[in-house]
Swiss-Prot record:
This is Succinyl-diaminopimelate desuccinylase. Zn(2+) 1 binds at residues 66, 99, 162. GO terms for molecular function: acetylornithine deacetylase activity; cobalt ion binding; succinyl-diaminopimelate desuccinylase activity; zinc ion binding. Coiled coil: none annotated. Pathway: Amino-acid biosynthesis; L-lysine biosynthesis via DAP pathway; LL-2,6-diaminopimelate from (S)-tetrahydrodipicolinate (succinylase route): step 3/3. Homodimer. One of its GO terms (biological process) is diaminopimelate biosynthetic process. Binds 2 Zn(2+) or Co(2+) ions per subunit. The keyword Zinc applies. Belongs to the peptidase M20A family. DapE subfamily. It comes from Shigella flexneri serotype 5b (strain 8401).
Amino acid sequence: MSCPVIELTQQLIRRPSLSPYDAGCQALLIERLQAIGFTVERMDFADTQNFWAWRGQGETLAFAGHTDVVPPGDADRWINPPFEPTIRDGMLFGRGAADMKGSLAAMVVAAERFVAQHPNHTGRLAFLITSDEEASAHNGTVKVVEALMARNERLDYCLVGEPSSIEVVGDVVKNGRRGSLTCNLTIHGVQGHVAYPHLADNPVHRAAPFLNELVAIEWDQGNEFFPATSMQIANIQAGTGSNNVIPGELFVQFNFRFSTELTDEMIKAQVLALLEKHQLRYTVDWWLSGQPFLTARGKLVDAVVNAVEHYNEIKPQLLTTGGTSDGRFIARMGAQVVELGPVNATIHKINECVNAADLQLLARMYQRIMEQLVA
């Protein structure tokens, strides 16, 4: 199958860019963008490679994505080696095919076609690419955004190429994401012998009523755009492994995926009040991974919906479900942010794959979005 989108996707898959290492992917993208007149600024931080590229001036539409991938797992369980792209029955297999090297290829090819047809486009077309999205995300998009904001860089619209679709390309478009807040909580007791409980203080017993009340809380009911806030306990650890020792500490880690009905400070206050109510001795550490954001109907959402309807003849759902994405950082710039990418059924799995025809379709959608916003 000869198609510039498929060929570029295959070239990217062959580069084993395990997060946060880029493995030469960005050099390939930069070469293609510079060839059509983009100015490229590398913005590397620690072991992470990033670049910001732009062409033209004025109202700015950026395409954002990541070159890094998650580990492939047991390579013997793949139908072909994970970094050797293979097409079978119209499906392109390889780590990163759907998340998100296919999107990157579609973006670049769309830009090439757009520039060829609109060499003097009236707005500015940009790319924000990182190699640190799948791992810590500490030195990736967030650092680039901070640098761009420090110099008052303009960003009006941003399309993130995350695999948003469920069954066919464009059936779901993400126009926002929930916030993510993690609590690392240690309940302190007194270690002792299980035969002498009066000489100890069991933190597991102490914490049980608190945890029961915590999991029963209805945090909110969501709203028109967001599902209700959810809280899930992810890890609990206590004890020495011995059956005759009362533990001295209990560690509990729980995560909130929260809507715009709450702030992280509201959640923290409610948890701390509950700890005090149960008279627990504790230490607590919070990690805010991202605030919730929402892009209401406007020029970007309308352009994306138009592109999907034009090429796939379906009306996309606008959803905010799922995990976090780098869109949470880009939204800080005041930009309208939307995610549109391929079907996500196999992301992070053994035998990750994407319909090759979907990538060709995605490139056409991306080009139509460019034409509506910056031509």
